Design a protein with these regions (language model features):
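A structural signal for multi-pass alpha-helical bundles of membrane permease subunits
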Residues: 19-313
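Short, Lys/Arg-rich, polar N-terminal cytosolic tail immediately upstream
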Residues: 1-19
């Protein structure tokens, strides 16, 4: 029995080595990405330990004294804990509610378009905003929504109304962030769903046409089931980053007037770590944030695996 086991193990190891040898060019192409990923993603994880230490640059990571859960308790007992958690969850769930279904809907609509020229124009025009940098996008929002010189303010003024200071409104901030995010990325995110629909067997549509199905029936009974596995995987991945709202755009659009709704975990970590030099506190907050994301990812993945055959793991 042991001889057979060792023989099988030897064969599997030989098979792995042989597979690597045959695919050597592919592994060499992967090597730079693996090295970069290891250096900038896995190696910095060593610094997580400062969340449990009274870290100072002078003492270094190893020389700093242990603090236990001191900085976690400091964050949990602070006023900013409830505020940052609430704002992060509101903006994140609002973003998912808008930007997750819209690419699916756009993919379904594009798949139904028959005029090829209009279809290409529509796709290109919706993809282009994705290539606008976050800094430029934030600048555009500030310029457009300026109550004195903004384009929207002037258009509203022609109708006899006055545009309020939306960038200074805590209530308006989540809407500005989410809908600018949708305008910028929905078209690009729909590419995955359009590609999925392009792989659907054309004979299914032909059979449905022969059975008297219209476009709506084809969409519901052919297109939507074809998209469900892809959409499920994307939803699981989105739920795994619920607590990680994009820092750049929020920080660029943030000001003292809207900070009660724009102060999220990532901006607070930046202010504590790089502005106030409270490295241990910022590391503790970041670690807490990542643990919550991991728990959500595993929970949603578990539910998905029980309810369907689709899961990440």
């Amino acid at each position: 029995m042991s001889a057979n086991h060792s023989k099988t193990k030897k064969k599997s190891s030989i098979g792995f080595v042989e597979g690597v040898r045959r695919s050597r060019p592919l592994y060499l192409l992967m090597l730079p990405s693996i090295i970069i990923f290891a250096l900038f993603t896995y190696y910095p994880m060593y610094g997580i330990v400062i969340a449990f230490k009274n870290f100072t640059p002078a003492d270094g990571i190893m020389g700093s004294s242990w603090a236990g859960l001191k900085y976690f308790k400091q964050y949990f007992n602070s006023y900013q804990f409830g505020l940052t958690i609430k704002n992060t969850i509101i903006i994140s769930l609002y973003t998912i509610a808008v930007t997750f279904p819209l690419p699916v809907i756009m993919g379904l609509l594009v798949n139904q378009m028959k005029a090829q020229k209009f279809k290409k124009f529509f796709q290109v025009s919706t993809y282009l905003p994705h290539f606008i940098s976050t800094v430029v996008m934030a600048g555009m929002m500030i310029l457009f929504l300026s109550p004195s010189t903004g384009i929207i303010a002037k258009l509203v003024g022609l109708l006899g109304f006055k545009l309020p200071n939306l960038m200074g409104s805590a209530k308006a901030f989540p809407h500005i962030y989410v809908w600018s995010e949708a305008w910028q990325h929905v078209g690009w995110d729909s590419i995955l769903y359009i590609a999925t629909l392009s792989s659907v067997d054309p004979t299914l549509y032909e059979a449905a046409t022969m059975d008297g199905a219209n476009k709506w029936h084809k969409m519901i009974h052919i297109d939507v089931p074809a998209l469900l596995p892809t959409a499920t995987i994307m939803f699981i991945m989105r739920m795994g980053s619920v607590m990680s709202v994009g820092f750049e755009k929020v920080y660029l659009l943030q000001n003292t007037l809207n900070s009660t709704s724009s102060e999220i975990i990532s901006t607070y970590v930046y202010k504590m770590g790089l502005v106030s030099s409270q490295y241990s506190l910022s590391a503790a907050i970041g670690l807490f944030n990542n643990i919550i994301n991991l728990i959500l990812l595993l929970a949603v993945n578990f539910i998905s695996s029980k309810m369907s055959d689709t899961s990440l793991i």
